[in-house]
UniProtKB/Swiss-Prot annotation:
SUPFAM superfamilies named in the record: NAD(P)-linked oxidoreductase
Protein name: Protein tas
InterPro entries registered for this protein in UniProt: AKR, AKR_Detox_Biosynth, NADP_OxRdtase_dom, NADP_OxRdtase_dom_sf
GO biological process: cellular response to amino acid starvation
Residues engaged in binding NADP(+): S234, C235, L236, G237, F238, G239, T240, L241, T242, G243, K244
Source organism (scientific name): Escherichia coli (strain K12)
Length: 346
């Protein structure tokens, strides 16, 4: 395994991290513990969870992911060797009730969310606590176009950052990060930290893959000059980049087979792009998933590539991508496809 020091922090993360959003839905607790055992044995030290997980979110399963990981941590006994990252949910974006009646990113809700996450995870602190998505209405989760609004968010970024700072001072959070953020949001957090002597955010967790390279426009430059590096998620586009959904295939137990609401990676242009990328991989004797993950890992703004798997075979294949370095010929062919199918699944 390779490791990377995140700027402006003492966090040294494995360049592959373990994503967990299937724990409690597609994966049982026994499955989850087996994945954790294997990942850690391979040198992975970054485990990413969220109070909302598993996905798709349901009241009856909310928090199970953290519970499963917490039970494993209690049994494993090496908490200090691991980097545990969790997330506080923002306001509901689907007009449902959310986790709490008033799911604003204010002091009250952050206090409650953090308390519950620590309890489920059976730990006294989090190495990284991330704002899962912004309080304000903005572009994330595949939203296209920008909806102009004259109203200010009910809770300002300063209020959110000040609340997070309180729990950092209390020793319950080591570092702060954001997720599903924009260049404006990242720069605003950094400006407020400097102006008010508050802790700066050290990471951003956004989607990044061959199907969604929008991070390269704006946020990559912020990452380079401000040192806020990417924890890349959805690097296989819900498994789409493996090619398993091509030609209308619906593999039993696969995420897009089970949950038809997830259409982000199902569009016609996306399928054409996937077919082209899979063709590149096969012509060069590469596993399509490993090629896609190796492309993400090689980007200079990526601190860690988060892996998601529902089977041990998938996890093993994904971790093996660590040993793959893409040739100049492969990279040139990838860029040629990107020129034709640019951001088919933002």
């Amino acid at each position: 395994m390779q490791y990377h020091r995140i700027p402006h922090s003492s966090l040294e993360v494995s360049t592959l991290g373990l994503g967990t959003m299937t724990f409690g839905e597609q994966n049982s607790e026994a499955d989850a513990h087996a994945q954790l055992d294997y990942a850690v044995a391979q040198g992975i030290n970054l485990i990413d969870v969220a109070e909302m997980y598993p996905v798709p979110p349901r009241p009856e399963t909310q928090g199970l992911t953290e519970t499963y990981v917490g039970n494993w941590l209690a049994k494993h006994g090496s908490r200090e060797k691991l980097i545990i990252a969790s997330k506080v949910s923002g306001p509901s974006r689907n007009n449902d009730k959310g986790i709490r009646p008033d799911q604003a990113l204010d002091r009250k809700n952050i206090r409650e969310a953090l308390h519950d996450s620590l309890k489920r995870l059976q730990t006294d602190y989090l190495d990284l606590y991330q704002v899962h998505w912004p309080q304000r209405p903005t572009n994330c989760f595949g939203k296209l176009g920008y909806s102009w609004t004259d109203s200010a968010p009910a809770v300002s970024l300063l209020d959110t950052l000040d609340a997070l700072a309180e729990y950092q001072r209390a020793g319950k959070i080591r570092y702060i990060g954001v997720s599903n953020e924009t260049a404006f949001g990242v720069m605003r957090y950094l400006h407020l930290a400097d102006k008010h002597d508050l802790p700066r955010i050290v990471t951003i967790q956004n989607p990044y893959s061959l199907l969604n390279r929008s991070f390269e426009v704006g946020l990559a430059e912020v990452s380079q000059y401000e040192g806020v590096e990417l924890l890349a998620y959805s690097c296989l586009g819900f498994g789409t980049l493996t090619g398993k959904y091509l030609n209308g295939a619906k593999p039993a137990g696969a995420r897009n087979t089970l949950f038809s609401r997830f259409t982000r990676y199902s569009g016609e242009q996306t399928q054409k792009a996937v077919a082209a990328y899979v063709d590149i991989a096969r012509r060069h004797g590469l596993d399509p998933a490993q090629m896609a993950l190796a492309f993400v890992r090689r980007q200079p703004f990526v601190a860690s590539t988060l892996l998601g798997a529902t089977t041990m075979d998938q996890l093993k294949t994904n971790i093996e991508s660590l040993h793959l370095e893409l040739s100049e010929d492969v990279l040139a062919e990838i860029e040629a496809v990107h020129q034709v199918y640019t951001y088919p699944a933002p």
